[in-house]
A protein has these predicted regions:
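C-terminal, well-structured catalytic/ligand-binding subdomain of enzymes
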Residues: 1-70, 78, 88, 101-108, ...
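Active-site pocket-lining segments that scaffold enzyme catalytic pockets across diverse folds
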Residues: 76-77, 81-82, 90-93
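Short cysteine clusters
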Residues: 96
Length: 347
């Protein structure tokens, strides 16, 4: 996993990313069908309108590497939405579990990020220090957009993919750009909710938002409807909320493309729920136990699925502590990443 540090204006950050790609001789054999290309181009226009900082960053990347900006941006806008479409079905492969919880006076977040193994070697944990936004850590299997993160104010944003109906995909911001937007622009869960309600969303996804006060939600998103789920409370007074690869509310059932169990979503949800219902203390150790299969199925996928946990994370929102296992957490140790805490203390 690469550990980038990016600082400055969108142009400076994009230029640095582009130069990294040039030094690594990175290639981008982008193949998009007509649906993806048209969707991506229209979504890119909306990114420019609603999130110009990210648009300018991508523009600087493509200028630096000499790649046509419109096509490159269209590809980024397809991520977490419709990157692979086969026989009229969205075939994007993502299976992740994320949850937030309180323990006493502190708030925590944890996740397994489950993807095809080839993405492990290009995944990144990026410290962003933009000159027009909040500092944040962005964990991503891509770049510029990402699956999860935490910012200097103790706000966490994370996405989980839910299979969309092809007929309901609309031009808009995809889940991984929504995560980036929240981290850069919002301090609290209430701000995050208002932000998601105001932005055009491209397809089915779940957006988990939590802040250091213990306020936490999952927003189930679709271009035509958004529904907010609120946390449960266990017998010890600890709150928790979980998201997997499904729209769980009855209110959003009409938008579900699959009634199946996407990469064992039901089992993963049950494992997290059963453990969090019993959580009393030892929050970090408890989160590690859940993520590493000690409480039930979470990440032990069969080899023939060509699918695995490529990283796992635990955040303490109250003090900005970040713990990350760069691989399957049942086999890899969690390391402490102090970059965000250090740069926040300096400012």
């Amino acid at each position: 996993m690469y550990h980038w540090r990016l600082k400055g204006s969108p142009y400076q950050i994009g230029t640095k990313i582009g130069n990294i790609f040039k030094r690594c001789n990175a290639e981008f054999p982008i193949v998009l069908d007509d649906f993806q290309l048209n969707y991506g181009i229209e979504s890119g226009k909306l990114l420019k309108q609603h999130f110009p900082v990210a648009y300018e960053e991508v523009k600087a990347i493509t200028y630096t590497i000499g790649y046509p900006n419109e096509r490159f941006l269209a590809w980024l806008m397809c991520m977490g939405c419709c990157l692979d479409i086969d026989e009229n079905k969205c075939a994007e492969v993502r299976g992740c579990t994320a949850f937030a919880f309180t323990c006493g006076e502190e708030t925590y977040y944890a996740r397994t990020n489950d993807l095809p193994p080839f993405l492990k070697k290009i995944s990144k944990s990026i410290l962003y220090q933009p000159d027009r936004g909040y500092k944040f850590i962005l964990n991503t299997s891509s770049f510029t957009n990402g699956e999860e993160g935490i910012n200097e104010h103790g706000l966490v944003a994370a996405m989980t993919f839910a299979i969309p109906k092809i007929t309901e995909i609309k031009a808009g911001l995809n889940s991984v750009f929504l995560v980036r937007y929240l981290l850069e622009k919002c301090k609290t869960t209430k701000e995050g909710i208002a932000t998601i309600q105001s932005l055009p969303v491209s397809s089915n996804c779940n957006i988990l938002i939590a802040d250091k006060s213990g306020d936490m939600v999952v927003i189930e998103c679709n271009p035509y409807q958004k529904y907010i789920r609120y946390p449960m409370v266990n017998e010890y007074g600890n709150k928790f909320i979980i998201t997997v690869n499904d729209l769980l509310s009855s209110e959003m059932a009409i938008h579900k493309a699959s009634q199946g169990d996407t990469f064992f979503s039901k089992e993963r949800y049950a494992t997290a729920e059963n453990a969090l219902l019993k959580l009393k203390d030892n929050p970090i150790d408890s989160a590690k136990a859940i993520l590493s299969d000690k409480c039930g199925f979470m990440c032990q996928y069969a080899k023939q699925l060509n699918f695995e946990t490529i990283w796992a994370t635990i955040f303490n929102l109250s003090d900005l502590s970040v713990y990350r296992a760069e691989g399957n957490p049942s086999k890899c140790s969690f390391i402490n990443d102090s970059r965000l805490k250090i740069c926040s203390e300096k400012s």
